[in-house]
């Protein structure tokens, strides 16, 4: 892994896990699989490079306060491909 993003779990109970991610340009999460449906709420604008388990690359622009939802099973590495620090909150729905 190039340079790991900082993650801070803010809430973790039987219903949800809420994690704040902070990425400097070029930092990444590392390959991971989402076990639960989840919501991402960007705190800052930014650009992500997502690399899936097959090596396919996709770019996404994030807009501050514009949340999005994904189903469980997504497997990818998330990289800040922008030029500024990127922060988002991920809420995993355990039930």
Region spans (language model):
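A short glycine-rich, His/Asp/Glu-containing loop-to-beta-strand
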Residues: 3-30, 37-40, 91
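Short, conserved beta-strand element in jelly-roll/cupin
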Residues: 33-49
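Short acidic-glycine-tyrosine-enriched beta hairpin
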Residues: 55-72
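Ligand-binding loop in jelly-roll beta-barrel domains
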Residues: 73-94
């Amino acid at each position: 892994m190039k340079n790991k993003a900082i993650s801070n779990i803010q809430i973790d109970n039987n219903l949800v896990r809420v994690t704040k991610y902070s990425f400097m340009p070029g930092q990444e999460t590392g390959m991971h699989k989402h076990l639960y449906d989840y919501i991402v709420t960007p705190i800052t604008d930014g650009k992500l490079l997502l690399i899936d388990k097959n090596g396919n690359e996709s770019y996404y622009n994030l807009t501050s306060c514009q949340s999005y939802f994904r189903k469980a099973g997504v497997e990818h590495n998330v990289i800040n491909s922008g030029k500024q620090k990127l922060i988002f909150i991920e809420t995993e729905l355990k039930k």
